[in-house]
Amino acid sequence: MIPITLTVRPSESRRWLAVIRQHFRRFEFTRLDDTESLMWMPRVGTVLVTDGLNEIRLQALASDNTKTELIMVELSNEISAAVPEIVPGSRLRLQWTFPRCIPAHLRS
């Protein structure tokens, strides 16, 4: 399994994080604690959402490189649908990482 992390930070105002949170409410959520939830997204699967004051972190698992690319496209599309940008990076900064460890909440 390939762990994928997308960290979303605002370039301007933190209000864009609230817009993303609102957009994600259309998906099925299971609240884990004050800052973490599991979200089910079609074509992606389970996503661990960690909600911070200045960022939102989305973590998912891919079975192979093709699925990794699909997850990256789907998450990017959802962020773009929530916060359309005329110039990429003008409102949000997206940072992709591929950690070595699988988050505990995504292990089965």
Residues covered by each model-derived region:
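Structural preference for solvent-exposed beta-strand-turn elements
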Residues: 34, 93-108
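Short, intrinsically disordered low-complexity segments
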Residues: 33-65
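Intrinsic-disorder/low-complexity, polar/charged segments enriched in Ser/Thr/Lys/Arg/Asp/Glu/Gln
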Residues: 1-5, 55-57
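Short secondary-structure junctions
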Residues: 25-32
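Short Lys/Arg-enriched alpha/beta "domain-start" segment
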Residues: 3-24
